[in-house]
Amino acid sequence: MTDNSPQPHRRGLNRRTFLAGAAATGAAAGLGALGSTARGAGTASAASRFPLPSKASSLHVLVTGDAGTGEKPQYAVTAAARRIHATTPFDLALGLGDNIYETGPKGPDDHQFTTKFEKPNAGLDFPWLMTLGNHDNTAVFPGDGGWLLRGDAEVAYHRRSRRWYMPARYYSVPLGVADVFVLDMNPLAAYIPPFLSPEWEPGGHYMTRQAAWLDRALRTSTAPWKIVCTHHPYANNGPHGPAGDFDGLPAPLNGVEMKRFIEKHVAGRAHFLFSGHDHSQQVLENVSGLKGTRQIVSGAAAKSVNGRSAGRFRAKYENYRDRGFMTLAIDSTSVVLTAHEVAANASGPTEAFTTTYRR
């Protein structure tokens, strides 16, 4: 393991105007201040934590995103995942951000970690590799992503939980047959950007360190499969839109700096880019700019956009109606991806789509 520290949204004039105004006045200048990664005293020792399958020749992976509500839909999705786990056990999970709705945790001992993560995921007893989302870094309004230090509480919680795995804001985990690289794109995709902060701003110390680390980690990885996880997607047919056009906002609020980062440091270097943020499930293909890296969106573990595809990117599968999750069966030569739907009136998951990727 390598670690490194330092409701559906709709496009609308009011929100766009507010956000642009916040950016213009430098509202985030004081919110993105330099700070070290939080370190909690903790109660979950390395010995008690659910073990990582670090030398696995095959993996069964649960993929969820935007899960942390603590409400009935989240429980329905995790109940469906437990049905699969009972017959074909998972080795680990990827949690793609927005882990604690609506405004993130107040600290590493916040009871929301229990009500919105531990209790809903009871019985899914394996490591959960967690990604920071915009709601996890809230400053002023839910999901603005403007208080980046708030996310450090989730890093500190790593030392208090058996299943929550987030040793730093960005990190990598070698898993034998696959290497996973969890990124923090929040400084480049916040609705209230960290202007005037040399630590957090685009081109600042934090993103420069993260880029250098990622370049080195991907270059030296010898795993058959390389999986990158972000909260914000590069490509997206849902209402949030893709990087460079998030929510129809002007630059830099539209994620254009994230778009450039992914194109420079991820595209063509990893096999998969898994993201959440949009409350939908999408299996996209042949995305221009990604140079063969496959964009997968799974952000429907507790919410649904109840919309339809914008059709901006070619898709093998899309669902904007149901909540759900994905599973991966990985060996040295193939990855079998399956999308599962969890309808409100259903007693279990529906296997909606499956596809196989080969080396």
Annotate each predicted stretch with a short phrase:
Residues M1-L13, A27:
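N-terminal secretory signal peptides
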Residues L13-A29:
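N-terminal export leaders
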Residues A29-R49:
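C-terminal region of N-terminal signal peptides and the immediate post-cleavage residues
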Residues G42-Q112, N237:
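N-terminal active-site segment of His-dependent metallophosphoesterases
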Residues K55, R82, P89, Y101-K226, ...:
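Extended active-site neighborhood of metal-dependent phosphoesterases/phosphodiesterases
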Residues V61-V63, A93-G95, M130, V228, ...:
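Residue-level marker for buried hydrophobic side chains located in beta-strands
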Residues D66, G97-D98, G133-N134, L183, ...:
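Active-site glycine-centered loops adjacent to acidic/histidine catalytic or metal-binding residues
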Residues Y317-R359:
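A short C-terminal boundary segment appended to hydrolase-like catalytic domains
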